[in-house]
Amino acid sequence: IKAYVRGTSQQMIWQSYYILKETLNYEIPKVVVLNVNAMRYGKDSDEVSEAYNRLTIDNMKWSKEKIEIIKESMTEEETFLSYVFPILRYHSRYDKLTKEDFEYLFKSKTNTYNGFLINKNIKPVENLPTKRTLASYEFPSECYYYLDKITKLCRENNIKLVLIKAPSLYPYWYEEYDENIKKYAQKNQIEYHILIEHIDDIGIE
């Protein structure tokens, strides 16, 4: 099966939309699998950060979609120009710049690992924070807005959209969250698979 992973750590739902939109400039897949975990995080969430924004955005090619994703994702402390000219992000170290900083400013070798350390070590979970009651289990409206746009984009391109909740123990995926997605999937006739229920089958320890 030919497949591509366009996801990154802590990728927000609006970022998934623009990355999908960019992908369709190069390839029309038969199926798009979307992890719905980010539906819990709105634009005012503490989980939105420059570090994760850059992990998602910096390696994208320059395009209309990259401009759009930057504008939608920037925190109040960020500037658009710092994405165009990354050197501006590190202006405080101007006196420490070397030849290599300029040599790789607009070109760099492909780094398929993007900072990840690949290993097979297993560290069992010892303690989990207590599951707390939330004031609301509703997803932010902007998350539904972009999920609608993803759904529409897939339909317009005759792509089958499959929603999943990837296995995770924490942060908790509440039953109420699950019901929200089930209702959305049923209303829009989309497959939804909660893989948390199949952790043993998948082989996650």
Residue locations for each model-derived region?
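Active-site-proximal beta-strand/loop segments in catalytic clefts of secreted hydrolases
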Residues: 6-8, 35-37, 164-168, 195-198
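Acidic-and-aromatic substrate-binding clefts and catalytic sites of carbohydrate-active enzymes
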Residues: 10-14, 138-143, 169-176
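Short catalytic/ligand-binding loop motif for oxyanion handling, primarily in non-cytosolic enzymes
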Residues: 40-44, 93, 170-173
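Active-site segments of SGNH/GDSL-like serine hydrolases
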Residues: 151-174
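C-terminal regions of proteins
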Residues: 175-205
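Secreted/periplasmic serine-hydrolase-like ester/acetyl group-modifying domain
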Residues: 49-157
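Loop/turn elements at helix/coil->beta-strand transitions in domains of secreted/extracellular proteins
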Residues: 2, 28-31, 155-162, 190-191
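Membrane-embedded segments
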Residues: 1-68
